[in-house]
Amino acid sequence: MGVALITPFKSDGSVDYNALVRLVEYQVQNGVDFLCVLGTTAETPTLTEEEKRQIKKVVIERVNGRVPILLGISSNCTQTVLNTLKNEDFTGVDAVLVAVPYYNKPSQEGIYQHYKAIAEATDLPVVLYNVPGRTGVNMTAETTLRLARDFKNIVAIKEASGNITQMDDIIKNKPENFDVISGDDGITFPLITLGAVGVISVIGNAFPREFSRMTRLALAGDYNNALTIHHQFTELFKLLFVDGNPAGVKAMLSMMGMIENLSLIHISEPTRLGMIS
């Protein structure tokens, strides 16, 4: 299991790097397999370039090689991603995560060409990220499989389309060296039973040990015990996303004393009471 790290903030709106260090250590000590830095859950589009660099630096230094780092470098502009690959320091980064271009609503051929340019510009492993609920366009199974077959350094997809049929199609027809990773906590268990290799988790920010255990049990074929843990989280899966991500998980972390309780972490009162219960 990987965790899509949140970005903790202070009351003045600046990044709380001390809280970030605590959160990273909490993840590593509780058995996560890798960390996803500067993904959707990190509120990356709202961060400055300097904040992104500093977050990357702080996380890599704290991890110190103990778990792999998957770094988000998404943009709806292909050239921006290429410039990032050319100009930024990727020391300590094990792979990059790149979402389908958002807002532009490209065609399937446009999506293919976006990833083609990126794959050809780096030797780093590239993880595709399909999240049509945020980008406005779905990358089809056909496009995903075409990319997986054409580029050896396109090694996986974080699939958050919510379309189990599409995900199953990818799993059944993918090359052997290409992995499917759940991008949605709530369907991680069923997706693993179909052949996915894990999850890039939101809920893992708050419950890394428990959700890692569920994932490992499922991967080992111990479906009964994995399902028991999955069911323990079912209500929380819903509550954490009622008021949007990452508001829910950040509210949960603030209740746990992991990050500062800020007014901008806005959740409804019914959601808050549900989390407490």
Describe the predicted segments one by one.
Residues V3, F9-G136:
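Active-site beta->alpha loop and helix N-cap motifs at the rims of alpha/beta catalytic domains
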Residues L20, K52, K56, V81, ...:
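A general structural signal for well-ordered alpha-helical segments in protein cores
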Residues A121, R134-F237:
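Catalytic alpha/beta core domains of metabolic enzymes, predominantly
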Residues N224-I259:
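Shared catalytic-loop signature of beta/alpha-barrel
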Residues V3, E25, E61, F189, ...:
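Generic alpha-helical structural context detector
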Residues V28, I60, A119, D168, ...:
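Structural signal for well-ordered, non-membrane alpha-helices
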Residues I265-S277:
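Single conserved hydrophobic/aromatic residue that forms the stacking wall/gate
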